[in-house]
Amino acid sequence: MPQDAPAGLAPGFLVAAPALADPNFNGSLVLMAEHHAQGALGFVVNRPGPITVADVLGGLDAGLRERAEGAGRADDPVLVGGPVQPERLWILFRPGPAAPEEGAVALGAGLALGGSRELLEALVRARDPGPYLLLLGYAGWAPLQVEREVGEGAWVPLPLQGDLVFDVPMEKRWETAVRRLGLDPAGFLVGGGGAEA
């Protein structure tokens, strides 16, 4: 049965229904950063890509790569944030005393988002920057597209919860989100759809 799409999906999460066949989003948990009349923007937060933090930092500055290695972050995967602009780097982080806030947007629930080289360098150089994720690309929806997909049951909205991003292992994020919806992942079945590729 279709459900009514909420008026404001951001900040929050979209949990992909198992029937969502689009390979870009099957089994995904999407952090919604923007949702307005012009469309929506979000980031898949549970899909590792083929490159690491060291790969990204090494292309910018060898010193940054060494700093990430020293902090034990060099082998962390860079996530596939979505199929739109897959070359564009985004940084999702937990603001804190050592984490810079300039060039970032607070999303709520202890999460902030930015995309500047300066922000990335400041996080890597900080003594204790707190957790952060690097993402390449994003998920984008045309006006009313995400509302239609939610109404068709392709996605189920979940309120923003910062711990889903930084305290739950990546491979458990979708399952944990489904459980927080009060559903059993094994029996969670609803309709189709998919964001823009």
Swiss-Prot record:
It comes from Anaeromyxobacter dehalogenans (strain 2CP-1 / ATCC BAA-258). It comes from the Bacteria. This is UPF0301 protein A2cp1_4106. InterPro entries: AlgH-like. The lineage of its organism: Bacteria, Pseudomonadati, Myxococcota, Myxococcia, Myxococcales. Belongs to the UPF0301 (AlgH) family. Pfam families: DUF179. PANTHER family: UNCHARACTERIZED PROTEIN YQGE, UPF0301 PROTEIN YQGE. One of its GO terms (cellular component) is cytosol.
